[in-house]
Amino acid sequence: MKEKITIPFYNDLLFKYFVYDNEDEGCQYILKKIIEEITPIRCKELYVINSELMTHHYREKRSILDVRVKTQEGEYINIEVQSTGLFESLHRRFQYYAFKNIALQIKSGDEYRKLQPVYQIILYHEEDKEYHELIRKFSIMDNKYHDDKGSLIHIYYVFLKEIEKIVKEKGKDHLNELEELCYVIEKGNECDRIKMTRVGQIMKEKYDKFMEDMNLREEAWAYEKAEFDKIAHYVDGEAKGKVEKSKSHVIKFYKMKYPNEDISWLENLTEKQDDEIFDMLLNNEDLEVIKRIIGK
């Protein structure tokens, strides 16, 4: 019997599934909550411009969510929302996208006052290794007065793994709404507080429905395997040109696929056994078959 596959809530495709439907009250609620908890923007109306899930070329292009927002003040702004991989390898790319989006707003000879600010919300499944902040904002700021009101770029980096430290410091019962939201996204379907907030309840309901769709489920899992390969490659250094199947990578991949299973049996295996397990995990082999082959 196949072991149950768990897809993390920050999975690119699943995350878009949570918020893509403009006609769905739950999707609108989650998206509004994400925007208002992470940024100072207060939304009156929301519209997802690229609402198609686009599973036919999903693995070829990241699912960046383009959102048109009408604020409480009546202003219209565009926000890009995305769940993605490593901060160090991608944060300059997102700055480039922001500058490019600004440049495309006007043509030569147009008035510059027509330029509208660009907002990005980017969720990373990692820690903030430099400042250890849950949210880090990037904008063009006045050095003396630390004022970014005139900035055309506002990028919000969310480091989901920082929630672990916050929970240890404050306790789960003292999380604010932003922290609660990040905790649910980070912990996913196995979150022990998933039914304690409306966002968690909606995500749980949508997750169960998502997992019933074989095409969506398989596409999301294929992405997880590909994403792990990229992360492992990055960690080991691009110059090596291949994924090193180290002990830490095997354990990390195993925990990604089987979050509730014991990992102690993986600790004292040989390098050859680690390589065999890694390959079998990539090929979606049954857990019992893996243990039998390894002799556990």
Predicted features and spans:
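Conserved single-residue anchors adjacent to enzymatic active/cofactor-binding motifs
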Residues: M1-E218
